[in-house]
Amino acid sequence: MEYPNIRSLREDHDFRQCDLASVLHVSQNTYSQYENGVIALTAERLVKLADFYNVSIDYLLGRTDNPEVNRN
């Protein structure tokens, strides 16, 4: 599965892959595989990333260009 925005979010915030790997409690190699679409993120890890960046899961999945979380 592809996650078109997780690499750009990481780079925009000047994080390294190992920084995000630590947040998700995975290896840097595993995180790299997420960014490259080799393996799928679990729902729990998608939520962690969305909360970490304060963006919607739909934004992480590339289903919207709007990163804002709809809290209605």
Task: List each language-model region with its residue ranges.
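Short, charged recognition helix plus adjacent turn
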Residues: 12, 61-72
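DNA major-groove recognition helix of helix-turn-helix
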Residues: 35, 53, 61-64
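DNA major-groove recognition helix of helix-turn-helix/homeodomain DNA-binding modules
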Residues: 25, 44-59
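Short basic helix-loop element that most often maps to the first helix and adjoining turn
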Residues: 4-23, 48
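Recognition helix of helix-turn-helix/homeodomain-like DNA-binding domains
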Residues: 25-40
